Regions:
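Compositionally biased linear targeting/interaction segments
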Residues: 1-182
């Protein structure tokens, strides 16, 4: 009927010229709950060589969150943060999207994103599957098999009508229906 509000970050102009946008958290990248391969795809979007390999960054994120003092490969716990002059890990899931910048090495790894882009990309909510109808392009890129041509097609299609199921989305793009690969 034309009175629906999109939850994909589309800008609106309200009364008095106020501009606003709404974004569904389930369309964002769930940093606390994503598998390593998906975290790697997020990091790869920076497109530049990182001083710290993705595997080490992911291990550091997991060590930042876990409650033990055991080290994963190329990672660190509280003593490593203290030696680097940083606040120690919380040993809890991240509380805000910007907290990722406190995990050793992630500030440099995500330097291709502004703070606003981090907030527009990452959520700390328990998001398992991505809402493909509200996810920004940066989040859709982490789907296995997604390329720029498929991304453009998906975004153009959902502007006209939403995908009714995840299966319809994957079939439309010619991708395997599993979002939990590889």
């Amino acid at each position: 009927s034309g009175t629906e509000i999109r939850l994909d970050g589309s800008p609106y102009k309200g009364q008095g010229g106020i501009r606003f946008a709404l974004q569904d958290d389930y369309g964002l990248f769930g940093i606390n709950w994503s598998p390593p391969w998906r975290l790697e795809k997020l990091l790869a979007q920076g497109g530049h060589p990182r001083p710290v390999p993705a595997e080490a960054l992911i291990n550091r994120l997991f060590d930042y969150q876990d409650r033990d003092g055991l080290y994963r490969l190329n990672s660190m716990e509280a003593d490593g943060y203290r030696k680097a002059g940083m606040a120690p890990p919380t040993n809890l899931p991240l509380a805000t999207p910007m907290e990722i910048m406190r995990v050793m090495g992630w500030k440099q790894a995500l330097s291709f994103l502004t703070p606003a882009e981090i907030s527009d990309t990452i959520t700390v909510e328990s998001v398992g599957a991505i809402n493909i109808n509200t996810a920004p392009a940066r989040v859709l890129r982490v789907i296995d098999g997604m390329d720029e041509e498929k991304l453009a097609r998906a975004i153009a299609f959902r502007k006209v009508q939403p995908f009714m199921t995840g299966q319809a989305f994957f079939a439309f793009l010619g991708l395997p229906a599993s979002v939990d690969s590889p």
